[in-house]
Amino acid sequence: MDADSDVALDILITNVVCVFRTRCHLNLRKIALEGLNVIYKREVSKVLMKLRKPRITATIWSSGKIICTGATSEEEAKVGARRLARSLQKLGFQVKFTEFKVVNVLAVCTMPFEIRLNEFTKQNRPHASYEPELHPAVCYRIKSLRATLQIFSTGSITVTGPDVKSVASAIEQIYPFVFESRKTIL
């Protein structure tokens, strides 16, 4: 088994965060009173609205900025954001769906082997930091992709990046390095 052989790794996207604007002022009190599945947080001037399908939670500010979390793909995030904008239109607001952007993607990938974290950190020192007293994972940053990876000794890797493509690229880029530091089975 070598690092160049094609190993199919499953990358499971667990959360996609997106932002969009409505181009109108939103009356949070009206949304709280008339909207469905809402929680009004008056002390921080925002409303949380939950959709069931797709399963998304939106944070709504009166300025018209909305952040959606909980989607499992970029397409699902866009569908959820549009559905949310539509529900605000039904409440009587002049909503225009603009400036949609995926800002963060969280994914998990499991390697088919365990990883020696001390060895991995020594070999990749400028990009990797490992402090076992504080956190059980190595933090590895890839600046060109704007991705951060949390690498655990079990072989589980958590990746945070700006989009799905950069998350997949980060896994492809890190695989040869973690392969070199894998634990050998006796």
Curated annotation (Swiss-Prot):
GO terms for molecular function: DNA binding; general transcription initiation factor activity. Belongs to the TBP family. InterPro entries: TBP, TBP-like, TBP_dom_sf. The gene is tbpl1. The keyword Iron does not apply. Keywords: Cytoplasm, Developmental protein, DNA-binding, Nucleus, Transcription, Transcription regulation. GO terms for cellular component: cytoplasm; nucleus. Part of a specialized transcription system that mediates the transcription of most ribosomal proteins through the 5'-TCT-3' motif which is a core promoter element at these genes. Seems to also mediate the transcription of NF1. Does not bind the TATA box. Members of the TBP family are differentially required to regulate transcription and development during early embryogenesis. Particularly regulates genes that have a role in catabolism. CDD domains: TLF. GO terms for biological process: DNA-templated transcription initiation; embryo development ending in birth or egg hatching; transcription by RNA polymerase II. This is TATA box-binding protein-like 1. The keyword 4Fe-4S does not apply. Its main location: cytoplasm. It is found in: Cytoplasm; Nucleus. Expressed ubiquitously with highest expression in the ovary and testis.
